């Protein structure tokens, strides 16, 4: 994340939460209903800043803002009360090692210009995944999750991602810390490893990727002396919105909604007021 960092700046985040903390203290958690009290637009610039780099095009950041708002409303719906939602937001930001010193103006502008906009499927909110760089094609939700409930996440071409300087990443791991026999068992239609055999045991591809610290589960395995080389394509899980691909579209004058329509062809951008949540 290419944003200025200053030690001990967690207080910046807390300043945004003070009005809601007082409400909880004096009125109790149950009385602080999310859908009535919590101003999502106020917290969104912080959330978006933790998800996408500041040097991206404004329309790309606006697309990410719509995604962030959609996912935030889902959290609110699931957790029901303010304390749980704020706690989860803070955990998410800390998990990215993100401590914001100054909110850059483009994040606030992106949130303001997309106020109330969310992504929906058949008029309902759905989880909206995103990643930094695809392997040239985003993944099918139905394939990844083996469920029709995620069929709204369609695989689309994103060949422009291959032009990114971060498209290819090599990770070298000493053979001694790996299973004696390791081989790829299956891939999905976008080329991401779905199953890997490790000494006869079947491991899920994305779990293996995270455990090994790989940038992507779209990888090949090569022997390199006493090490094994994992050559990874793309960055992230490959589902949904490719930030790099979307940014290249923005450079060609695509707006936020056009970008989202491309990466989520089954979904619609609506105002949250018209969505049952």
Residue positions per predicted region:
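Conserved, single-site charged/polar hotspot
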Residues: 1-277
């Amino acid at each position: 994340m290419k944003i200025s960092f200053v030690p001990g700046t967690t207080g910046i985040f807390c300043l945004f939460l003070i009005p809601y903390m007082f409400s909880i203290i004096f009125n109790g958690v149950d009385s602080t209903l999310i859908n009535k009290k919590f101003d999502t637009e106020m917290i969104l610039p912080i959330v978006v800043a933790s998800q996408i780099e500041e040097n991206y095009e404004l329309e790309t950041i606006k697309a990410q803002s719509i995604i962030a708002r959609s996912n935030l409303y889902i959290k609110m719906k699931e957790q029901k009360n303010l304390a749980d939602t704020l706690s989860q937001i803070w955990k998410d930001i800390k998990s990215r090692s993100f401590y914001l010193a100054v909110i850059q103006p483009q994040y606030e502008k992106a949130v303001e210009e997309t106020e109330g906009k969310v992504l929906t499927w058949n008029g309902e909110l759905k989880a909206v995944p995103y990643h930094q760089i695809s392997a040239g094609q985003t993944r099918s939700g139905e394939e990844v999750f083996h469920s029709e409930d995620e069929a709204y996440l369609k695989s689309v071409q994103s060949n422009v991602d291959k032009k990114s300087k971060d498209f290819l990443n090599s990770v070298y791991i000493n053979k001694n810390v790996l299973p004696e026999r390791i081989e790829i068992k299956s891939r999905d239609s976008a080329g991401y490893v779905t199953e890997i055999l490790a000494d006869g045991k079947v491991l899920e591809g994305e779990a293996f990727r995270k455990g090994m610290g790989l940038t992507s589960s779209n990888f090949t395995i090569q022997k390199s002396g006493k090490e094994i080389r994992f050559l990874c394509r793309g960055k992230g899980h490959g589902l949904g919105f490719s930030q790099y691909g979307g940014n290249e579209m923005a450079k060609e004058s695509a707006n936020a909604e056009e970008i989202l329509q491309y990466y989520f062809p089954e979904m619609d951008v609506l105002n949250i007021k018209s969505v049952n949540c």
